[in-house]
Amino acid sequence: MVEIKILKKTDDSITFILEGVDVAFANALRRTILGEVPTFAVDEVEFYENDSALFDEIIAHRLAMIPLKTPVDRFELDALELDDYTVTLSLEAEGPGIVYSGDLKSDDPDVKPANPDIPIVKLAKGQRLVFNAFAKLGRGKDHAKWQPGFTYYKYFTRIHISKEIEGWEKLKKLAKKRGLPVKENENEVIVETIKPFYIPKEFEEYEGKGIWEEIVPNTYVFVVETNGELPVEEIVKIALKILMRKADRFINELQGLAG
């Protein structure tokens, strides 16, 4: 049975334990988050004036990498086919001053820069910048600008520390200071590595003897971070739904081939 236990959640990241799946599924979830969850990003730019020190192409690249809010309730983001919808972000600015992402004016109030304080270009006195940028839905597998964030996972392990080794109390103290769950019995201390725990060099001689690591089967610690386009928990939900839809499509096609 698949279980998810949330360890920590902030506005821009979530850490959870995924239990009851093999490494193939864990990696499929990671790849789906990075490559399949759609977001809005600038895909084309029409420049009308650009007197700045930067070429059009450089500004266009900077615009493409600005995270844009992507409304979950308006678009079927877990669909295998994306909506053909374009948002126009316009700008008309004159120096002196710095042009920020918050200066972009969107024709859709729900699709706008997630962070208004990203600098785009510095304009000197008399310099002007006028353009229309066109954003559309896309997937990270086509370009990194559509990635909703970043994710990685590690095996969930337990480090067993024998009380027969000299200085075991120090390792217990270090683990607690690191914020790791610690269990203890009369023979050993057990540290659960919900995040990395590095054994000091002075204890290297005990590794494999008085100190050993147990890999918990089919259990992983996942970390997901959002760029701001989507709430972090929605990224995980959408990725899981996309995986389910792909599996359903695969099964249906197999049944069709079987006649």
Curated annotation (Swiss-Prot):
| Pfam families associated with the record | RNA_pol_A_bac, RNA_pol_L
Q: Can you state which reaction this protein catalyses?
A: RNA(n) + a ribonucleoside 5'-triphosphate = RNA(n+1) + diphosphate
Q: Which UniProt keywords apply?
A: Cytoplasm, DNA-directed RNA polymerase, Nucleotidyltransferase, Transcription, Transferase
What Gene3D superfamilies does UniProt report for this protein, alphabetically? 3.30.70.3110, DNA-directed RNA polymerase, insert domain (2.170.120.12), RNA polymerase, RBP11-like subunit (3.30.1360.10)
Q: Which GO terms describe its cellular component?
A: cytoplasm; DNA-directed RNA polymerase complex
Q: Per its record, what are the GO molecular function terms?
A: DNA binding; DNA-directed RNA polymerase activity; protein dimerization activity
Q: Which GO terms describe its biological process?
A: DNA-templated transcription
Give the primary localization class.
Answer: cytoplasm
Source organism superkingdom: Archaea
| Matching InterPro entries | DNA-dir_RNA_pol_30-40kDasu_CS (IPR001514), DNA-dir_RNA_pol_insert (IPR011262), DNA-dir_RNA_pol_RpoA/D/Rpb3 (IPR011263), RBP11-like (IPR036603), RNAP_Rpo3/Rpb3/RPAC1 (IPR022842), RNApol_insert_sf (IPR036643), Rpo3/RPB3_RNA_Pol_subunit (IPR050518)
Q: Where in the cell is it found?
A: Cytoplasm
Q: Which SMART domains match?
A: RPOLD (SM00662)
- EC number(s) recorded for this UniProt protein: 2.7.7.6
What is the similarity comment for this entry?
Answer: Belongs to the archaeal Rpo3/eukaryotic RPB3 RNA polymerase subunit family.
What interactions and quaternary structure are annotated?
Answer: Part of the RNA polymerase complex.
Matching HAMAP family: RNApol_arch_Rpo3 (MF_00320)
Q: What does this protein do?
A: DNA-dependent RNA polymerase (RNAP) catalyzes the transcription of DNA into RNA using the four ribonucleoside triphosphates as substrates.
Protein's name in the database: DNA-directed RNA polymerase subunit Rpo3
Which species is this UniProt entry from? Answer: Pyrococcus abyssi (strain GE5 / Orsay)
